[in-house]
Amino acid sequence: MAAAKPDIRFGLFNRGQFQQGDDIPKRFGEMMEQARLAEKLGFDAFMKGSHFSTYPLHDFNQVTFLSRLTAETSKIRLVAGIVLLPLHTPVEVAEQFANIDLMSNGRLVFGVGIGYRDVEFQAFGVERKGAVKRLEANLTAIRRLWTEERVTMEGPGWKLDEANCSIPVVQRPHPPVWIGANADPAIERAARIADAWFVNPHNRIDTTARQIEVYKRALEKAGKPGLPDEFTMIREVVVAKNREEAFRMAKPYLEAKYSAYHKWGQDKVMPQGDNDLGLDYEELVRDRFLFGSPDEVSEQIIDLVNRFGVNHFVMGVQFPGMPHSMVTDEMQMLAEDVFPKVRQGI
């Protein structure tokens, strides 16, 4: 009997970031349209990131954005990718995302991470040097608040005394917890304390290959042999008639986004040897993003699935300044011309 083909899921990463001076009310309506279209086209998940004080970009707040999506959609999973957990207190976060899980009827994926921008830590009055401790303590408290009637514990800057989460989560025991991580120690931490690590879009494929081995060893050490049931990779994807057109079409938008990443200091938390997002566009995209025709992009995804055991592929297709029609055209092409080829080819 032939082995069953692995299941593969496809998600959409919508950063919800736009240039200064853009028509933000109009863009918000377009993002809601993109979410509804993603569900109609059969995408499995819609992911929204989180940053604060995002000059030179506008960025919609993650919690309010996902809350709105609970009403705009009915089936697609809603991924918080990621909550900057050290900036917050556990009761606040537990209650916010319990509400989202309840309002969506159990469609939340709770993604967390440390963050890397000094402006955010300073704005929230949090010392960056204690971020790892805060992440772990906050996550422990949130899990307990989601699963216990009363919680008594202390953490950095907060104290719970018979505290509870005012709204119950729908998923049992709680929504999936994913950790976004760039550096090797953070990946090892994800293996230890999260349900899954979701692979960032910034690193070259050779770096990703090495870090997946780091993750596997850390899972083994944590008593969790093998990859998680849902192993998610994020990649920037641009599909067009051919690779040259995709390369040209995406250039002004990806350049603007990665220039902002570089200025924000995203590079500083990436591994040595692959920690410069200020490269020229031609060098930046090489062996990092997926560009090409539907056939070419399908082949690239199939290769990543087969090499790394990925079974949930989240695609970044919306970048600051990109016209709405360009985003929806690409979504349509992915759903109609890429997803079937990938499912047939794996």
Regions found by a protein language model. Give the residues of each.
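Acidic (Asp/Glu)-rich catalytic clusters
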Residues: 2-5, 39-40, 66-74, 97-108, ...
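An alpha-helical appendage that flanks or caps ligand/catalytic pockets
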Residues: 2-6, 12, 130-165, 204-311, ...
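Glycine-rich, proline-tolerant flexible connector loops at the mouths of alpha/beta enzymes
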Residues: 45-69, 84, 201-205, 316-327
